[in-house]
């Protein structure tokens, strides 16, 4: 009866030894890179085995785990996948990921993972957050203010067109809310822009003071309090032109008439051929 107990003890001991022997370490909690440049994410691991597999995964804001690249320990040649490549040093137990020509879509959390050849369980590192800074051409920083036409206590400030080196910080005023820096990528126009939004319900809220805790360029354009955008003016600018609508309807009607004439001629021709 002692044999089953011994076997269970052996299994538990083996599992504990495996969990203690295999570790994955990522020493870079966060890395940043300028768009189109190269960045390297480091990863080290500890194992007593000689046959195993290594992986790099990326986790975008959607939280989905996406396999980037894998490396078999028995292969001496480093794995490559388009712009992604690894530097695998088996003796040093190092497995770094190199990303060339960084794109905005590369921004994500990257996880290094280890898997034994005899165990399907993946062991992950803590992850490295990669931030890709857009390459802004000819930045022209400006702050615009929009007030609600129905309530003077509601105001929104848009800080836009600033370079990637500018950091946007939260306001010390608890009544002022500022979003994180976001990137507008208009690929059809080959144009990128950084932007951040601040808002408050305070009646004395002014855009000139909204970003006081952020280091912004000295040449940033600020509107005067009298020149803030009015919602009614914005809505009016999008009103349709009656004459333009009539012309569009006329063109559509003319095209329909031409199609009917062409269809009638085709029908008469077919009837003549059939007779």
Swiss-Prot record:
<feature type="glycosylation site" description="N-linked (GlcNAc...) asparagine">
    <location>
        <position position="201"/>
    </location>
</feature>
<keyword id="KW-0472">Membrane</keyword>
<feature type="region of interest" description="Connecting peptide">
    <location>
        <begin position="229"/>
        <end position="250"/>
    </location>
</feature>
<feature type="transmembrane region" description="Helical">
    <location>
        <begin position="251"/>
        <end position="273"/>
    </location>
</feature>
<keyword id="KW-1064">Adaptive immunity</keyword>
<dbReference type="InterPro" id="IPR007110">
    <property type="entry name" value="Ig-like_dom"/>
</dbReference>
<protein>
    <recommendedName>
        <fullName>T cell receptor alpha chain MC.7.G5</fullName>
    </recommendedName>
</protein>
<dbReference type="GO" id="GO:0009617">
    <property type="term" value="P:response to bacterium"/>
</dbReference>
<keyword id="KW-0732">Signal</keyword>
<feature type="region of interest" description="CDR2">
    <location>
        <begin position="71"/>
        <end position="81"/>
    </location>
</feature>
<feature type="glycosylation site" description="N-linked (GlcNAc...) asparagine">
    <location>
        <position position="167"/>
    </location>
</feature>
<keyword id="KW-0675">Receptor</keyword>
<dbReference type="InterPro" id="IPR003599">
    <property type="entry name" value="Ig_sub"/>
</dbReference>
<dbReference type="InterPro" id="IPR013106">
    <property type="entry name" value="Ig_V-set"/>
</dbReference>
<feature type="glycosylation site" description="N-linked (GlcNAc...) asparagine">
    <location>
        <position position="212"/>
    </location>
</feature>
<keyword id="KW-1133">Transmembrane helix</keyword>
<dbReference type="InterPro" id="IPR036179">
    <property type="entry name" value="Ig-like_dom_sf"/>
</dbReference>
<dbReference type="InterPro" id="IPR015370">
    <property type="entry name" value="TCR_alpha_C"/>
</dbReference>
<dbReference type="GO" id="GO:0002355">
    <property type="term" value="P:detection of tumor cell"/>
</dbReference>
<feature type="region of interest" description="T cell receptor alpha variable 38-2DV8">
    <location>
        <begin position="22"/>
        <end position="116"/>
    </location>
</feature>
<feature type="region of interest" description="CDR1">
    <location>
        <begin position="47"/>
        <end position="53"/>
    </location>
</feature>
<feature type="region of interest" description="CDR3">
    <location>
        <begin position="112"/>
        <end position="124"/>
    </location>
</feature>
<feature type="region of interest" description="T cell receptor alpha constant">
    <location>
        <begin position="136"/>
        <end position="275"/>
    </location>
</feature>
<feature type="disulfide bond">
    <location>
        <begin position="157"/>
        <end position="207"/>
    </location>
</feature>
<feature type="domain" description="Ig-like C1-type">
    <location>
        <begin position="154"/>
        <end position="242"/>
    </location>
</feature>
<feature type="domain" description="Ig-like V-type">
    <location>
        <begin position="22"/>
        <end position="116"/>
    </location>
</feature>
<keyword id="KW-1003">Cell membrane</keyword>
<dbReference type="GO" id="GO:0002419">
    <property type="term" value="P:T cell mediated cytotoxicity directed against tumor cell target"/>
</dbReference>
<dbReference type="InterPro" id="IPR013783">
    <property type="entry name" value="Ig-like_fold"/>
</dbReference>
<dbReference type="GO" id="GO:0038023">
    <property type="term" value="F:signaling receptor activity"/>
</dbReference>
<keyword id="KW-0325">Glycoprotein</keyword>
<dbReference type="Pfam" id="PF07686">
    <property type="entry name" value="V-set"/>
</dbReference>
<comment type="function">
    <text>The alpha chain of TRAV38-2DV8*01J31*01C*01/TRBV25-1*01J2S3*01C2*01 alpha-beta T cell receptor (TR) clonotype that displays pan-cancer cell recognition via the invariant MR1 molecule. On CD8-positive T cell clone MC.7.G5, likely recognizes tumor-specific or -associated metabolite(s) essential for cancer cell survival, triggering killing of many cancer cell types including lung, melanoma, leukemia, colon, breast, prostate, bone and ovarian cancer cells. Mediates cancer cell cytotoxicity in an HLA-independent manner. Has no reactivity to healthy cells, even stressed or infected by bacteria.</text>
</comment>
<comment type="subunit">
    <text>Disulfide-linked heterodimer with TRBV25-1*01J2S3*01C2*01 beta chain. The alpha-beta TR associates with the transmembrane signaling CD3 coreceptor proteins to form the TR-CD3 (TCR). The assembly of alpha-beta TR heterodimers with CD3 occurs in the endoplasmic reticulum where a single alpha-beta TR heterodimer associates with one CD3D-CD3E heterodimer, one CD3G-CD3E heterodimer and one CD247 homodimer forming a stable octameric structure. CD3D-CD3E and CD3G-CD3E heterodimers preferentially associate with TR alpha and TR beta chains (via TM domain), respectively.</text>
</comment>
<dbReference type="InterPro" id="IPR052051">
    <property type="entry name" value="TCR_complex_component"/>
</dbReference>
<dbReference type="Pfam" id="PF09291">
    <property type="entry name" value="DUF1968"/>
</dbReference>
<dbReference type="GO" id="GO:0042105">
    <property type="term" value="C:alpha-beta T cell receptor complex"/>
</dbReference>
<feature type="region of interest" description="T cell receptor alpha joining 31">
    <location>
        <begin position="119"/>
        <end position="134"/>
    </location>
</feature>
<keyword id="KW-1015">Disulfide bond</keyword>
<keyword id="KW-0391">Immunity</keyword>
<feature type="glycosylation site" description="N-linked (GlcNAc...) asparagine">
    <location>
        <position position="248"/>
    </location>
</feature>
<feature type="signal peptide">
    <location>
        <begin position="1"/>
        <end position="21"/>
    </location>
</feature>
């Amino acid at each position: 009866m002692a044999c089953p107990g011994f076997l269970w003890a052996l299994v538990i001991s083996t599992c504990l030894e495996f969990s203690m022997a295999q570790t994955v370490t990522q020493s870079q909690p966060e890395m940043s890179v300028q768009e189109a440049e190269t960045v390297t994410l480091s990863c080290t691991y500890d194992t007593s085995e000689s046959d195993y597999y290594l992986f790099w995964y990326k986790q975008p804001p959607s939280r989905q785990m996406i396999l980037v690249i894998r490396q078999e320990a028995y292969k001496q040649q480093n794995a490559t996948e388009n712009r992604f490549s690894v530097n695998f040093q088996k003796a040093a137990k190092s497995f770094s990921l190199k990303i060339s020509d960084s794109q905005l879509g590369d921004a994500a959390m990257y996880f290094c993972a280890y898997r034994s050849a005899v165990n399907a369980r993946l062991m992950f590192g803590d992850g490295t957050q990669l931030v890709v800074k857009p390459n802004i051409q000819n930045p022209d920083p400006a702050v615009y203010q929009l007030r609600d036409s129905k309530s003077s206590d509601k105001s929104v400030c848009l800080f836009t067109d600033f370079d990637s080196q500018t950091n946007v910080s939260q306001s010390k005023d608890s009544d002022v809310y500022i979003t994180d820096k976001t990137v507008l990528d208009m690929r059809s126009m080959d144009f990128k822009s950084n932007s951040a939004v601040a808002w408050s319900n305070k009646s004395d809220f002014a855009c000139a003071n909204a970003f006081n805790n952020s280091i912004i360029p000295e040449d940033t354009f600020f509107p005067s309090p009298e020149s803030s955008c009015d919602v009614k003016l914005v809505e009016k600018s999008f009103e349709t032109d009656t004459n333009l609508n009539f012309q569009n309807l006329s063109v559509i009607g003319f095209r329909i008439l031409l199609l009917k004439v062409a269809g009638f001629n085709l029908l008469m021709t077919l009837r003549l051929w059939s007779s």
